Amino acid sequence: MVWQRRLAHARPGGLAAGAPPGHHRRQHRRFRRWTPSDESRWELQARQLRYSDGNRRDQLDLSGSQRMWANPHVLVDGLFAASAGRAEDDRAVDYFNPRHSSAVAAGVRIEQIGWRRYDDAFRQRLEVTAGPTYQSGFGSRWVPALAYRHLWSLGDGSALSYGVSWSRPVYDGQREQQLGLDLDFRWGGTP
């Protein structure tokens, strides 16, 4: 069983989410991860965002995974995530700032090991999740999400992963479509 905790402070040079130029934010974050075994992992995170216009947002997130089935080449994990957040005030601003928001999602992750030879391995991963999200003033809507990735563990301790993700989130009552492509290369670890 492993417990990890972290306290972080960040002052990104970039913009606040969806904010016009000139809006910046500072982030304070407390993070706790509990890994009772290789088959279960839970994370709890509390964040506070302080925007340059004086607004403040508090957020609490819980996420976890639990192994449901395994054989030598396929792993199936159940996924769960929940979050709740609130803004200090409900004034009109130029970025996403609901007075109250919450979300719950559940899903499944299927990982197939294509091949493995000593420290080299190729895996592919599919994640499917869905759940309701709530925003004060706009009610609840269901949000689906789908992601597919390739993960390469290279014998020298480095790792390469890439994939595509799709979701249909709702902001201020308007449904959006998000499509993401990502590429990640790391030294000294597995993806």
What do these predicted regions represent?
Residues 1-191:
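Gram-negative and organellar
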